[in-house]
Amino acid sequence: MEVNILAFIATALFILVPTAFLLIIYVKTASQND
């Protein structure tokens, strides 16, 4: 079973992009509350 590098990159981006987006929103909200 070969590892499809493009599928791996797509999966990594699919996970990292929303995570980074949520982290940015969290940091902005935390700084506003402070």
Swiss-Prot record:
It is a single-pass membrane protein. SUPFAM superfamilies: Photosystem II reaction center protein M, PsbM. InterPro entries: PSII_PsbM, PSII_PsbM_sf. Pfam families: PsbM. PSII is composed of 1 copy each of membrane proteins PsbA, PsbB, PsbC, PsbD, PsbE, PsbF, PsbH, PsbI, PsbJ, PsbK, PsbL, PsbM, PsbT, PsbX, PsbY, PsbZ, Psb30/Ycf12, at least 3 peripheral proteins of the oxygen-evolving complex and a large number of cofactors. It forms dimeric complexes. Belongs to the PsbM family. One of the components of the core complex of photosystem II (PSII). PSII is a light-driven water:plastoquinone oxidoreductase that uses light energy to abstract electrons from H(2)O, generating O(2) and a proton gradient subsequently used for ATP formation. It consists of a core antenna complex that captures photons, and an electron transfer chain that converts photonic excitation into a charge separation. This subunit is found at the monomer-monomer interface. NCBIfam families: PS_II_psbM (TIGR03038). This is Photosystem II reaction center protein M. It comes from Sorghum bicolor (Sorghum). The gene is psbM.
